[in-house]
A protein has these predicted regions:
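Short, surface-exposed acidic/glycine-rich loop or hinge patches that mediate macromolecular interfaces
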Residues: 57, 85-86, 258, 269-271, ...
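Phosphate-binding loop of NTP-binding sites
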Residues: 3-203
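Short glycine-/acidic-enriched loop or helix-start segments at secondary-structure transitions
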Residues: 90, 114-115, 135-136, 171-173, ...
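Buried hydrophobic packing segments
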Residues: 67, 71, 91-95, 277-287, ...
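Short polybasic/polar patches that bind polyanions
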Residues: 31, 72, 260, 285, ...
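ATP-dependent carboxylate-amine ligase
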Residues: 1-26, 201, 208, 218-233, ...
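Acidic, Mg2+-coordinating active-site environments of NTP-dependent enzymes
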Residues: 126, 130-316
């Protein structure tokens, strides 16, 4: 009976693509789950080598792409929701559309407990939890509580890979089994002494007292301890040292493991991508791939859809950097700070459901970092005026700010003088609009094909 339902859902996917209504990354799964609510359980059980599940607020698409590249280099082709459709229907679509012996699924933070209960994965990577879409998710502690409950239920059957530098994630290790791997950064030169915003401060998950930070790397990720109960950051099994950031050209670091050191040359920018790489290498090790092999595979890594992706449009190179919350935006801004100015920038701030209706997060992002480092700036999207206002208050020259709400027209405006490089910073639905626009112009493939 499941075969008939799968066939019907596959036909829906082919029809969706043929009629130009999308890439068929969600609709087939929605149809299948309507026909059989237990389809994920049944199809997941057919993966002979089990599945790996990845979740995080920031970086899950890139980390999943990194792990997929590592697996392919090892001769293992996973069933993978690579287009980033990461709720139940996206996972179901990947399971019915692809064939393979093991699964690799990025999963939305709120949907993770349900997907994990259905898939019973061999390995779960939990990379970070940041404030994001508060109108949808609520505070991060609520998600952490749900993840703790999930981890306890799976502790006997699932290996966990956890970010030692995120106190919300590391705490989950108190509830997992012995097969738990930690990763983190150990480079004082890339740290500040504490999280930069009060909203990023964290309380001890054991006793509730404020944590003290020895150093912080990205938002609340860092080295911390509790002065009240003695809780401390776990010692990582894999860590990054000797970090050198090269702006948009990538980064270099040494990856320290129990079996030796490996030189990572990653062609993706920023500390956030170093965390993504560490997460992928640690997870690959948990599923049987040596760190040295993973490091070699990542040296050939290409940017995924909208995550430091570069696209040529006539004489201009468009670098696309997704922003969706303060922590992620700050890391993009820190990366751009290393670029030679003045910078040509294109912002697209939307407030659609998939972006989060609440755009107040832009006031917590450090746009002040680029004050005095910018040239032509175009703001677009449904909340273009609010984006321009935020930049004005960040000290960006008002005469350099242009508001063009329409994404199509705004792109024409920012490109009309043929700048050598344009840095595009869209929110999620604006990124989808941008990619479709570029695909219509034959400048890029559609997002589900990238």
């Amino acid at each position: 009976m499941i075969r008939t339902k799968v066939a019907a859902a596959r036909w829906i996917g082919r029809l969706s693509r043929a009629t130009g209504r999308g890439g068929g990354t969600t609709l087939p799964g929605r149809v299948l789950l309507k026909l059989d609510p237990d389809a994920i359980d049944k199809l997941g059980a057919s993966l002979r080598n089990g599945s790996t599940v990845i979740s995080a607020t920031n970086g899950k698409t890139t980390t999943a792409a990194m792990l997929a590249a590592i697996l392919r280099a090892a001769g293992r082709e996973p069933v993978h929701n690579r287009a980033g459709s990461n709720m139940t229907w996206g996972v179901a679509t990947a399971l019915l559309e692809q064939r393979g012996d093991e699964g690799l699924f990025e999963v939305d933070e709120a949907w993770l407990p349900e997907v994990a209960e259905r898939l019973r994965p061999k390995t779960i990577l939990l990379a970070n939890l940041f404030r994001d879409q508060l109108d949808r998710y609520g505070e991060t502690e609520a998600l952490a509580d749900a993840w703790v409950e999930m981890a306890g239920a799976l502790a006997d059957s699932t290996s966990f890979v956890l970010n030692a530098d995120d106190p919300l994630i590391a705490d989950i290790g108190r509830h997992t089994g012995p097969s738990t791997t930690y990763f983190g950064i150990d480079d004082d030169g890339r740290a500040v002494t504490e999280p930069q915003h009060a909203s990023e401060a964290k309380q001890c998950r054991v006793c509730g007292e404020p944590l003290l930070y020895e150093r912080a790397f990205v938002g609340h990720l860092g080295h911390y301890s509790c002065p009240a109960c003695g809780l401390a950051r776990p010692e990582p099994d894999l860590s990054a040292t000797e970090v050198k950031l090269l702006g948009m050209d990538g980064l270099k670091a040494t990856i320290e493991t129990a079996t030796g050191s490996h030189s990572l040359d990653l062609p993706l920018p920023g500390l956030y991508n170093l965390y993504n790489a560490l997460a992928a290498i640690a997870t690959a090790q948990a599923i049987g791939i040596p760190p040295g092999d993973s490091v070699a595979a990542l040296s050939r890594m290409k940017a995924v859809f909208g995550r430091a992706e570069r696209i040529r449009i006539g004489p201009s190179e468009l670098s696309i950097l997704l922003i969706k919350n303060p922590a992620g935006a700050n890391e993009v801004l820190r990366t751009l700070e290393l670029e030679e100015g003045p910078l040509t920038l294109w912002f697209a701030l939307n407030d659609n459901i998939a972006d989060g209706r609440d755009i107040s997060w832009v006031w917590d992002a450090d746009f002040e970092l680029l004050s005095g480092h910018v040239g032509n700036v175009v703001c677009s999207g449904t909340r273009a005026a609010e984006m321009a206002l935020r930049l004005k208050y960040a000290g960006w020259p008002e005469q350099d700010l242009t508001v063009v709400r329409d994404i199509d027209r705004s792109l024409e405006v920012v490109l009309e003088d043929g700048p050598e490089r344009v840095f595009a910073l869209p929110t999620y639905t604006a990124l989808l609009e941008l990619r479709e626009l570029l695909a219509d112009q034959d400048s890029a493939t559609r997002y589900w094909q990238s």
